[in-house]
Regions:
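GIY-YIG nuclease catalytic motif and its immediate N-terminal context
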Residues: 1-50, 63, 70-86, 103
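Generic low-complexity segments that are intrinsically disordered, proline-rich and/or Lys/Arg-biased
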Residues: 22, 58, 91-92
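Short arginine-rich
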Residues: 52, 86-93
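Cytochrome P450 catalytic domain signature, combining two hallmark sequence patches
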Residues: 54-60
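Coupling/hinge elements of helicase-like and P-loop NTPase modules
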Residues: 90-103
């Protein structure tokens, strides 16, 4: 199942501050090739801004140019992240085959 809020936003600080809430949820980073990373956090806005400031661990897969997110409770977000990793198989999350066994 894709992101419930699938509207892709530009992966820039101004867009993150304007669009991403400081709330619990799951987020995805994308580029022209597709989804490159899916994460979960208790503060979507802060985590996305932190990704901008960190060295780019996704360099081999291309820099992120967009993001999307969906709100979810702390109890739901880890399961939702795993579900999305299995579905999208983003290269930044490593090999999703081990997660497929859990479903």
């Amino acid at each position: 199942m894709p992101f419930r809020n699938c509207f892709a936003r530009t992966f820039k600080a101004a867009a993150i501050r304007r669009e991403a809430p400081p709330s619990s949820g799951v987020y995805g980073l994308s580029n022209a090739r597709g989804w490159i990373y899916v994460g979960e956090t208790d503060d979507i806005q802060a985590r996305l801004l932190a990704h901008l400031e960190e060295p780019n661990p996704f360099a081999a897969h291309g820099a992120p140019t967009g993001f999307s997110f969906e709100l979810s409770s702390p109890g739901e977000r880890i399961a939702r992240q795993r579900q999305m990793i299995v579905e999208f198989d983003p290269p930044g999350n490593g090999d999703s085959r081990s997660m497929r066994k859990a479903f």
